[in-house]
């Protein structure tokens, strides 16, 4: 199994697991308050595994208790692991509780969740859970305008992370969030924010996972500001269930949620007119928060689609009901050539992209040479890789990025080569090698060069009166485990910072002049 391509393709499942883990760790009283919102119940249901969804739909409209043995009978023998995982997840979320009879192995749906989720499915008493739609005014906001706004906000964040020179930077709250989430850190020399290892991993995820990464960090920060986590989560789940292109009133929102709208504007999740803050519009980034259908390959996919429309002169009109191109839908589609990479055995790289964001990401580990209208060329060099490594990006991440964005022809060629090997030797255990092995191995070797150099804080001992004094002190440092390096010929040794005082005290006792 090749782990590297899975970094992106499994991003949708990755963010689901992370959100579920956050929800599972909430105290039960907080979970119960969350389940009072039908929109939140619907969103949580969407985040569950398929088997957990099946169990909930089987129990939602029946009042009798259910035996765990019955659930076990519904599952095939080879799916027992998924069964236990689904039961465990529902128990941690307190979606299922002990039955009223108190008999062992008898369970029932959480009564609060059951009532709210039933209302969400049947259109019952949902109150303000799914927002209050308000009438449009004379100057309506189109979906193309919302896509352009969301792309501009999200593009600003991603460009800032990769260090592209910009005329504008994200707001203070966004910068604080990037630091708090450890996606960026302050460079000791320049005193400016730079991308971290986690930040580059963030760029490898799909848009859903990226947004949830920031929102989960926002939740942890909100707790430090004494913001009610139930209000925060309810608003996040609510905007994920709203209809794109509709205007919604802020009436009915708590003060915490109204404050949140200001922050969500900076992330491109909602749009508000400065002249009328009494209503807001969810953007496409918001409506795909809990979506299982649409998965944009990367945030730059949404950005690039808007850039292409601008270049083609598309104004406020909607293209086939969406402002996102078909090549931006479905993770990893081979039809999406924008940003596709070709890597040669001579370390030359070609990227079919004119996206400033894509080019900026490449510049983190590639020495760019030439830029054409729809393509850039560059060279993978020792210096460019070492620069990336010094910035916290690992060799595996660089390889993963290039494999994930490899041109479909490279994938087909790798597949053909693997088939030929299997024809000659059916027992061959080689895996699909999309990138040239020489390039992959060399990038890993360049990382090993840096890994060989390890720095320690400590003290150097030298200029001894005689060989015996050197040998006794060096042996003592070795015996107590503080000796880091020694050179018998030069009569020098190096001890750790913590062991320096012990060595000095021993020298005073052993060699003090009488």
UniProtKB/Swiss-Prot annotation:
Where mainly found?
Answer: nucleus
Q: Name one Pfam family in it.
A: Tfb2_C
Keywords, in A-Z order: DNA damage, DNA repair, Nucleus, Transcription, Transcription regulation
Asked if the record carries the keyword DNA repair, the reply is yes
In the record, biological process GO terms are:
nucleotide-excision repair; transcription initiation at RNA polymerase II promoter
What GO molecular function annotations does the UniProt record carry, in alphabetical order? ATPase activator activity; double-stranded DNA binding; RNA polymerase II general transcription initiation factor activity
Subcellular location(s) of the protein: Nucleus
Q: Which residues form the signal peptide?
A: none
Q: Name one GO cellular component term.
A: transcription factor TFIIH holo complex
Transmembrane parts of this sequence: none
Query: Record's PANTHER family?
Result: GENERAL TRANSCRIPTION FACTOR IIH SUBUNIT 4, TFIIH, POLYPEPTIDE 4
Family to which this protein belongs: Belongs to the TFB2 family.
Function (record text): Component of the general transcription and DNA repair factor IIH (TFIIH) core complex, which is involved in general and transcription-coupled nucleotide excision repair (NER) of damaged DNA and, when complexed to TFIIK, in RNA transcription by RNA polymerase II. In NER, TFIIH acts by opening DNA around the lesion to allow the excision of the damaged oligonucleotide and its replacement by a new DNA fragment. In transcription, TFIIH has an essential role in transcription initiation.
Q: How does it assemble?
A: Component of the 7-subunit TFIIH core complex composed of XPB/SSL2, XPD/RAD3, SSL1, TFB1, TFB2, TFB4 and TFB5, which is active in NER. The core complex associates with the 3-subunit CTD-kinase module TFIIK composed of CCL1, KIN28 and TFB3 to form the 10-subunit holoenzyme (holo-TFIIH) active in transcription.
> Could you identify this protein by its name?
General transcription and DNA repair factor IIH subunit TFB2
Q: Which organism is it from?
A: Eremothecium gossypii (strain ATCC 10895 / CBS 109.51 / FGSC 9923 / NRRL Y-1056)
Its gene name is TFB2
